[in-house]
Amino acid sequence: MDLTNYIASIKDYPKAGITFRDISPLMADGKAYSYAIREIAQYACDKDIDMVVGPEARGFIIGCPVAVELGIGFAPVRKPGKLPRDVVSADYEKEYGLDTLTMHADAIKPGQRVLIVDDLLATGGTVKATIEMIEKLGGIVAGCAFLIELEGLNGRHAIRNYDYKVLMQFPG
């Protein structure tokens, strides 16, 4: 199935010169959404994964059904102030400065094998911060999976030492 047919490209959103890749049409089509989830789960099935981790918000949309498909748990990565218990955090660079991500300090146990799932790999800042937190907790990043990679933004460089899968590529 060609999943690129289920991605809407919106020019000049959220600002001039940017083409936003909207996954809403993919999620609205049960067959395409299910296919994408199964493809990621298939990638993970031989990696002995213990936990799926996904950054907010679209990482939840993809990561949770992957975790269900694999029969394992899901741990959310959130912005500061959104998680109620003790957290670990990691800073990452955005286009106009630094931002921070957090996850519960007890979300990953030492030695657990983790699959990071998100909708988009662009510059790699989000996934790099997520990797940092997982490893700080003693987890092992067994793989990363993304619906879309924006080529030319060097996101692959951030995960060059990790196994990963991308279902679709678009110009960055």
UniProtKB/Swiss-Prot annotation:
Entry keyword annotation includes Cytoplasm: yes
Pfam families reported for this sequence: Pribosyltran
Recorded superkingdom: Bacteria
Principal EC category: transferase
Record-linked InterPro entries: Ade_phspho_trans, PRibTrfase_dom, PRTase-like, UPRTase/APRTase
Molecular function as annotated in GO: adenine binding; adenine phosphoribosyltransferase activity; AMP binding
Gene Ontology terms: cellular component: cytoplasm
SUPFAM superfamilies on file: PRTase-like (SSF53271)
Pathway, per record: Purine metabolism; AMP biosynthesis via salvage pathway; AMP from adenine: step 1/1
Alphabetically ordered keywords of this record: Cytoplasm, Glycosyltransferase, Purine salvage, Transferase
Subcellular locations according to the entry: Cytoplasm
Any Gene Ontology biological process: purine ribonucleoside salvage
Record EC number: 2.4.2.7
Keyword presence, Glycosyltransferase: yes
Catalytic activity: AMP + diphosphate = 5-phospho-alpha-D-ribose 1-diphosphate + adenine
Subunit and partners: Homodimer.
Alphabetical list of NCBIfam families matching this protein: apt, PRK02304.1-2, PRK02304.1-3, PRK02304.1-5
Sequence similarity: Belongs to the purine/pyrimidine phosphoribosyltransferase family.
Classification via HAMAP family: Aden_phosphoribosyltr
Role description: Catalyzes a salvage reaction resulting in the formation of AMP, that is energically less costly than de novo synthesis.
Protein name: Adenine phosphoribosyltransferase
